Amino acid sequence: MRDIFLLIVMLASIPYILKRPVMGALMYAVFSLMNPHRMTYGFAGTFPFVMIIAVVTLLATVASKEEKKVPFTPVVVQLLILVFWVTLTAVFALNPTGAWDEWSTVMKTMLIVILTIAVVRTVNDVKALLLTVVLSLGFWGFKGGLWTIATGGHNGLLGPPGTYISDNNTLALAMITSIPLMVAVASFAPTKWTKRAAIGVAVLTAISVIGSYSRGALLGGAAMTLFLWLKSHSKLKTGFLFALVIPLLLVAMPPAWMERMHSIDNYQQDASAMGRINSWGFAINVANHLPLGGGFATFTPKIFQIYAPDPTVFYVAHSIYFQVLGEHGYIGLFLYLLMFLFAWRTGSRIVRKCGTNPEYAWAATTARMCQVSIIGYMTAGAFLAMAYYDLPYYVLAILVCLEKVLFIAPQPDNTPPLRLPFLSRRKQQRDAWKRPEAAAAPRKR
């Protein structure tokens, strides 16, 4: 039943994608971030939903008469330079077959990100993109938070199988990166209940991070929380809320969770931690011997025999930094970090341009929350091989699109606001009864 439903949804979306290519970018984001096809039990698990959506979106973009503009901001230019560099390293990869397979996957992500930047034209398009990302990951945060509460935190969490976020650690990283985006959605929510819903999902997502039993997520969550407080408008209120809620959540967790977190102090006795250190040493050795790095898919047992400090202990990179270092060398790591630095500066530039204009308050909040999202990803990612995960690149796209539609190439926004039709009618009815003339008129019995 789920398989048929997903197929119907995908087919029904094609006319909308052909009419407005941005709808294709949003549909692609849903399938790449939420992975609904991985929650099915039949043909949908292997059906090429993503490929079909991507092809239709590309065709719609080429055929559409809408203006399509990719602003060559520092973030976009740096992304293109990084694409060139990782392609060059793939040519000289130590594991050619695996390298080109992974190169193909990464290039699809980069292409869709650039395509998304091109087809997002208006303020409502940016809001729709942000809302799509939040709903796609908020599903897992909402579900995981309720599961953690229902089980008292005794059972861990898992994401959709066969995806970037299939295990507890990678799922927790995605949740940490998405929480600030949920706060951003709350800043432009059209009604009070939608704002409360966004905050509620953010709280449940934070609970799911704690319930993931991920030690890297604990550190990433701490960094994200600190910057969330620093970027908040009311630091006193936000700080008081954090000081009240966080200790209660930690105290409510079972002893097994506490033991897991305390193992950070005894990393010398933790085989997993020592294996990660060995893989980091492997990445450094590869980068020292090969200026281009080892190319994609370098972390293999065979290549470990040559470059690892302890060739008998094989682990994957377990760090976005050492993953990029080992696969693309010191230059690749520099380009990767520079891209996120430019993204941070883009956020600061948006905040500065928005100033105190109340019309742009939501945009300033969104830019700040994207910065917090980057901090969460860069901190939690220090312990996970998630350098090519889609979500952080969508955060970069949101920042670029936000600057584009507000300051670089603003377009008249004729698209309807993000509001469900029946909710719009009810709101209009409430507003009508609030008017003096309506209040004075007698109601019909």
Question: What residues fall within each predicted segment?
Answer:
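Hydrophobic transmembrane alpha-helices and their immediate junctions
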Residues: 237, 328-374, 398-399, 404
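Long extracytoplasmic/lumenal interhelical loops at the membrane interface
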Residues: 157-163, 265-328, 349-364, 369
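Transmembrane signal-anchor hairpin modules in multi-pass inner-membrane enzymes, especially those
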Residues: 1-88, 97, 101, 121-131, ...
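Membrane-interface micro-motifs in multi-pass membrane enzymes
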Residues: 1-3, 44-51, 101-102, 164-176, ...
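Alpha-helical transmembrane segments of multi-pass inner-membrane proteins
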Residues: 8-17, 57, 80-91, 108-115, ...
